[in-house]
Amino acid sequence: APTKAPDVFPIISGCRHPKDNSPVVLACLITGYHPTSVTVTWYMGTQSQPQRTFPEIQRRDSYYMTSSQLSTPLQQWRQGEYKCVVQHTASKSKKEIFRWPESPKAQASSVPTAQPQAEGSLAKATTAPATTRNTGRGGEEKKKEKEKEEQEERETKTPECPSHTQPLGVYLLTPAVQDLWLRDKATFTCFVVGSDLKDAHLTWEVAGKVPTGGVEEGLLERHSNGSQSQHSRLTLPRSLWNAGTSVTCTLNHPSLPPQRLMALREPAAQAPVKLSLNLLASSDPPEAASWLLCEVSGFSPPNILLMWLEDQREVNTSGFAPARPPPQPRSTTFWAWSVLRVPAPPSPQPATYTCVVSHEDSRTLLNASRSLEVSYLAMTPLIPQSKDENSDDYTTFDDVGSLWTTLSTFVALFILTLLYSGIVTFIKVK
């Protein structure tokens, strides 16, 4: 098994309010670690406390588990904060802090008790209604005695432990634009989170029918906070999703009615209508970087993919920053932008940068390109501004190249003229 840090869970004894002369038992459950050997130390504040640590046990999955407990008088427990510090040879320490819970006795006397109910239903209080009928002196005494007995019973009876289980939550993730365009696939992910998922089962339906393939079941995962999660993935051809086929994920659990989530492509989709690529230039030193701004607008829904290419090679995502598409003013469509950082190259060799945009309603990839010679831009003292690729208010790189060619030709002819004049003069002198 690979190296794994332990998961640490704090445990406190019972729900009954302890008496002043009875101890409080605290425990740390350390589980799911590999390799073996952990060190457990208890502290009250900064002072270590004597504890009892049980032998390690190897689970069926080859990971280890152990537990450690501390017993302390109630009065001492209320005086400070207790910590269980776990050190694993292959990972960093984990600390769990114990806090004294609210008194169960106070809870029982201040609110009526309720029987546990299924999630989503109403719980009915079980307190008896007060009797208003006059029953005479003997009846009043019996009534007082009965009320006294009921009060004593409420004070001595152990209340129900509060449930800390996490309710099941189901989430359905629709296909990412990257998968739709780069893989020509529509991948759906159904995700469930809860406290006890060993009997949970996720199923799929495509247009009301069970798919015959393309389903990938994930393993049950246990997390450090005590919760569990499980997922299932369904992969379909992109054409089915574009055709508006409905996809349904259903969670089946023995203790709950089936929970269904449906994904359906938005029918009123609109492809982008405008794409622009602007140059952001500044008068920074030659070693500084330049910036390109790609803007796209007029699309719906907001799921869109903006990528950058440098000479037909994909740029790493760490080199540019996309923005989450906001809605356009007084419109049902969205707009987005991405800023690319172009580092100054060591040589004046120009590079072509392309902004590629894909949307689920576009039949083709939109793109806009710009050829940059960054060293020339950095050495030219320009006022910071935004220039559109279609405007003519700046010197193009083709013009710059022609200028250098003309100048080189002039210098070469001038040198040849000098050589010719020198040779003729030398012949005449001889």
Curated annotation (Swiss-Prot):
Residues 106-118 have a biased composition (Polar residues). CDD domains: IgC1_CH1_IgD (cd16092), IgC1_CH2_IgD (cd16084), IgC1_CH3_IgD (cd16094). The keyword Glycoprotein applies. InterPro entries: Ig-like_dom, Ig-like_dom_sf, Ig-like_fold, Ig/MHC_CS, Ig_C1-set, IgD_del_linker, Immune_Resp_Modulators, Immunoglobulin_dom. The chain crosses the membrane at residues 407-427. Keywords: Adaptive immunity, Cell membrane, Disulfide bond, Glycoprotein, Immunity, Immunoglobulin, Immunoglobulin domain, Membrane, Secreted, Transmembrane, Transmembrane helix. SMART domains: IGc1. GO terms for molecular function: antigen binding; immunoglobulin receptor binding. Pfam families: C1-set, ig, IgD_del_linker. Residues 96-167 are annotated as: Disordered. One of its GO terms (biological process) is antibacterial humoral response. Disulfide bonds join C28-C84, C190-C249, C294-C355. Residues 1-406 are extracellular. Residues 138-158 have a biased composition (Basic and acidic residues). Glycans are attached at S109, S110, T113, T126, T127, T131, T132, N225, N316, N367. Residues 428-430 are cytoplasmic. Residues 6-98, 175-263, 267-373 form the Ig-like domain. GO terms for cellular component: blood microparticle; extracellular exosome; extracellular space; IgD immunoglobulin complex; immunoglobulin complex, circulating; plasma membrane. The keyword Ligase does not apply. Constant region of immunoglobulin heavy chains. Immunoglobulins, also known as antibodies, are membrane-bound or secreted glycoproteins produced by B lymphocytes. In the recognition phase of humoral immunity, the membrane-bound immunoglobulins serve as receptors which, upon binding of a specific antigen, trigger the clonal expansion and differentiation of B lymphocytes into immunoglobulins-secreting plasma cells. Secreted immunoglobulins mediate the effector phase of humoral immunity, which results in the elimination of bound antigens. PANTHER family: TAPASIN. Immunoglobulins are composed of two identical heavy chains and two identical light chains; disulfide-linked. An IgD molecule contains thus a delta heavy chain combined with either a kappa or a lambda light chains. Kappa light chains are found predominantly on the membrane IgD (mIgD) form and lambda on the secreted IgD (sIgD) form, this fact is poorly understood. Membrane-bound IgD molecules are non-covalently associated with a heterodimer of CD79A and CD79B. IgD is not present in every species and this does not relate to phylogeny and evolution. IgD is present in primates, dog, mouse and rat whereas it is undetectable in rabbit, guinea pig, swine, cattle, sheep and Xenopus. This is Immunoglobulin heavy constant delta. It comes from Homo sapiens (Human).
